[in-house]
Amino acid sequence: THINLDELTHLQAINKKLGAGYHICEQDNVMWQELDQHIESYSALFSALGHDLKHDSRGFYYFASDESTPNMGKISRAIALTIYILIEHFANTGKDPMRALFDEVNDLELMQTLVQINKHLFDQLEIFSGSDLRKDVYLRMVRLGLAREVEGGFMLQAPIHRYIDALMEVNEETYITEDEQ
């Protein structure tokens, strides 16, 4: 693949974001369009640099990683738990959980409710209030491109599907294991 660096006008910004674990999605207009238009060049360049650029058909790009650092594992667990609890909460309140995940603003009141109802789970992650959840999980999700801050709270973005996929895999493995017993 011939790579014309002059065409990759946002290479530095894209590399910095992806290298920090950020997921570039359609809301990241300029970077998203450039990746979309020059995907072959970016894939070849990042591959030569030792990165595995992934494009998810649900609308986002990211570097595949093994998430081997202990700290990233803790962050991922906190995000996964929050997503799982949100899905459960929306289902319990009679909403379509998948629609609500992406359509509802996650405000401080909701965060406080989630922490109170699931205190035993959040305590293990040292999250004791809605403010802790906001600071330790939601602001981290913004830094990773999984959510964006809006007036009154946060909106989840398409890259959250990576966590939903992982939760579904765990769920399927649990059922398979139970069936085999």
Predicted regions and their residues:
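Short basic alpha-helical hairpin corresponding to helix-turn-helix/winged-helix-like nucleic-acid-binding
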Residues: H55-L110, I117
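Minor-groove-contacting beta-hairpin "wing" of winged helix-turn-helix DNA-binding domains
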Residues: F60-A64, G153-A158
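Short acidic, hydrophobic short linear motifs in intrinsically disordered regions
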Residues: G21-V30, R99-L125
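Short amphipathic alpha-helical interaction segments
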Residues: E34-Y42, L125-R143
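A short, conserved structural fragment
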Residues: L49-H55, Y138, V142-G152
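Short, amphipathic alpha-helical interaction segments positioned at domain boundaries
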Residues: K74-A78, P159-Q181
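Eukaryotic partner-binding/assembly regions in large regulatory complexes
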Residues: T1-G73
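Leucine-rich, amphipathic alpha-helical/linker segments
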Residues: L11-C25, A91, P97, L101, ...
